[in-house]
């Protein structure tokens, strides 16, 4: 395993630990999820470049599309919760149930 792969896996692990530790605020959880998605994107792109597997060239782009959709939905939910309750606590999401 090269140093680049270890750095990317370390970034993914740090984002995962951050998500598990700071899960009380929605904004910090969204930032950690975004860090995880970006490290997965870089890892997928490096793996495809190193293996010369041409059929999987679209996988990093599809991963970026899913990350953009996740970020847009998360930010919309953050704006709605902060406008409604005045805080960005994840506990406020339980109050949105019908």
UniProtKB/Swiss-Prot annotation:
Name this polypeptide is given: NADH-ubiquinone oxidoreductase chain 4L
Membrane-related topology note: Multi-pass membrane protein
Enzyme nomenclature, EC number: 7.1.1.2
One biological process term in Gene Ontology: ATP synthesis coupled electron transport
Reported function: Core subunit of the mitochondrial membrane respiratory chain NADH dehydrogenase (Complex I) which catalyzes electron transfer from NADH through the respiratory chain, using ubiquinone as an electron acceptor. Part of the enzyme membrane arm which is embedded in the lipid bilayer and involved in proton translocation.
Membrane spanning residue stretches: 1-21, 29-49, 61-81
Transcription regulation recorded as keyword: no
Domain of life: Eukaryota
Gene Ontology cellular component terms for the protein in this record: mitochondrial inner membrane; respiratory chain complex I
Pfam families documented for this protein: Oxidored_q2
Recorded coiled-coil stretches: none
Keyword terms, alphabetized: Electron transport, Membrane, Mitochondrion, Mitochondrion inner membrane, NAD, Respiratory chain, Translocase, Transmembrane, Transmembrane helix, Transport, Ubiquinone
Chief site of localization: mitochondrion
Recorded name of the encoding gene: MT-ND4L
Native organism: Balaenoptera omurai
Quaternary assembly: Core subunit of respiratory chain NADH dehydrogenase (Complex I) which is composed of 45 different subunits.
Catalytic activity: a ubiquinone + NADH + 5 H(+)(in) = a ubiquinol + NAD(+) + 4 H(+)(out)
Similarity comment: family membership: Belongs to the complex I subunit 4L family.
């Amino acid at each position: 395993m090269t140093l680049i792969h270890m750095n990317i896996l370390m970034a993914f692990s740090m984002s995962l630990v951050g998500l598990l530790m700071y899960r009380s605020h929605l904004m910090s959880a969204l930032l950690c999820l975004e860090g995880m998605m970006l490290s997965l994107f870089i890892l997928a792109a490096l793996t495809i470049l190193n293996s010369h597997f041409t059929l999987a060239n679209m996988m990093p782009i599809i991963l970026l599309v899913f990350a953009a959709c996740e970020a847009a939905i998360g930010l919309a939910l953050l704006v709605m919760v902060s406008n409604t309750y005045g805080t960005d606590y994840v506990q406020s999401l339980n109050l949105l149930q019908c």
